[in-house]
């Protein structure tokens, strides 16, 4: 097995399942954990564009199973080319587990 694939399989991670139709983006953050946990999930959405700024924050506590991707929420956003959008998802058990991931990745335009 490829070492990179093995490393990904052995580590907890947050990924984003994203689809786009025109300016409409559907973003589904998913978490895969190596151990089940009762975790605090925070989803922060920041947007800045010609019509102003907005910020939304969702927080919830979820019982997350191990070794399977779990969709945390579904976001549908109309993002015009001049908009700057950042979504940050954080999953923490308050002890040893703390994951955070941003969409879009910093290498993409935000």
Curated annotation (Swiss-Prot):
Annotated keywords: Chaperone, Periplasm, Signal
Signal peptide segment: 1-8
Subcellular location: Periplasm
Gene Ontology terms: cellular component: periplasmic space
Location (main, coarse): periplasm
Matching Pfam families: Tafi-CsgC (PF10610)
Stored InterPro entries: Curli_assembly_CsgC/AgfC, Curli_production_prot_CsgC
Function statement: Plays a role in the extracellular assembly of CsgA into thin aggregative fimbriae (Tafi) fibers. Assembly may also require CsgE. Tafi are thought to be assembled via an extracellular nucleation-precipitation (ENP) pathway, and possibly also via an intracellular non-CsgC-dependent pathway.
NCBIfam families reported in the protein's UniProt record: PRK10102.1
Family label: Belongs to the CsgC/AgfC family.
UniProt name for this protein: Curli assembly protein CsgC
UniProt organism field: Escherichia coli O1:K1 / APEC
Encoding gene per record: csgC
